[in-house]
Every structure is written in C-alpha cells, then in structure tokens.
Design a protein with these regions (language model features):
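Alpha/beta-hydrolase fold nucleophile elbow
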Residues: 190-195
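Cap/lid segment of the alpha/beta-hydrolase catalytic domain
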Residues: 56, 64-176, 184-187
Length: 195
C-alpha cells in the first residue's frame, strides 16, 4: 500500500473509449493504431500488433518501451515498421540487436500492445522546433532527433517538479497508464485473457 501511495493519487476510473485511428497489414501481421483513455485527462496513443493469420484468441503481452534518452519516439522504439526513421534504425541496432521486441513477440504468436509512455513519442514535451516542423517526426534528420532529445532531457527536472506541484508523480502516471493498458488489452476480442 505504501508503494502505491508514493506514486501519487489513484486516478478516477474511466472508460477506455478506444478509437482505432489506423490499421495496416505488415509482413508479420496487422498493426493497428489506437487511442484510449487511462485517466480523465489522458488519451494514450498505442499500437496493437496482431499475429499474421490469427484465428481465434491468442496470449497477449504489454511491451513497454525503454527510456534510453530517446524522447522523440516511444512505442516506435520496439516495432519494425519495415521503413523506419533512420534514428530508429540506429536505435534498434544499438539497443535491440536490430530486432525490436514487439515485432519479435508478434512473430511468436502474441497479441502485443505498446503505448507511448509519458513523456515520450506523441506524449513528449513540445519544443519550438516541433511546432516549426509541424510535429512531423519523419522530417527530422538524425541530428535533429539527437538535438531535440538533448533538449527534452534538459527539461526532465522541471517536468518532475511541475508534476510534484500538481500532486502527481512521473512513476505514478506511468504505473496507472500501464495498469489501464492491461485493462484495455483484456477487452480486445483477439486476446485470450487466461493466457
């Protein structure tokens, strides 16, 4: 109980209200982008990966991306899209032996969900450079990605302080997002909740 209390207040329960915003076939199966609620104030972007040829239900896993100082991308860190951003290709080689985990798990028959943890990917701190680029990460060079990641890292302490003043904690936000992600995953018709 003390560990949960240290993470800050328990957020009010919310309906996930999932919305599918994109779905495409990949060589390893189906990639669906969804957004769903984890708190009254948060809509969380996620990818759900479904194994190729899935019939019936399959075991499922929540695959959490790393921190690694890479703020510009979140859930993309653990998926092979086939045509990845050059910064992600570099990241996959350095951190995942070129084999992102979500893609490897879906190839082994798991339904996989991965979210953008706060404050990564689509949930990261917005910088002036993001606004100028129209927030399209595909337009960034590898050096742009490195520069923006350095800038985000330099703002981490201010972010933590701001959350604390608001009565929240970064680990608490992450924890409850992860709990609500499991809750949402178990509602998916492709998931065998017993496995």
């Amino acid at each position: 109980a003390a560990v949960l209390e240290a993470r800050g207040p328990r957020p009010a329960p919310v309906e996930a209200r999932p919305e599918s915003v994109d779905r495409r076939e990949m060589d390893w199966g189906t990639l669906e982008k969804v957004v769903f609620s984890t708190r009254p104030e948060f809509r969380v972007p996620a990818y759900v990966l479904l194994p190729k040829g899935l019939r019936g239900r399959a075991p499922a896993i929540v695959d959490l991306h790393s921190h690694g100082g890479m703020f510009l991308f979140g859930k993309e860190k653990i998926i092979n899209f086939g045509a990845n951003h050059p910064a992600m290709i570099e990241y996959h080689k350095a951190n995942y032996a070129g084999r992102p985990t979500a893609t490897e798990l879906v190839r082994r028959g798991y339904v996989v969900i991965t979210i953008d943890a706060f404050p990564f990917g689509e949930r990261r701190l917005m910088m002036d450079e993001d606004i100028a680029a129209g927030w399209e990460r595909a337009k960034y060079s590898i050096e742009d990605v490195r520069r923006l990641n350095r800038k985000c890292r330099s703002k981490e302490s201010a972010l933590v302080k701001s959350l604390t003043y608001a009565g929240l904690t970064w680990p608490g936000i992450t924890f409850w997002d992860d709990v609500r992600t499991v809750d949402y995953l178990l509602t998916r018709p492709e998931v065998d909740a017993s496995r």
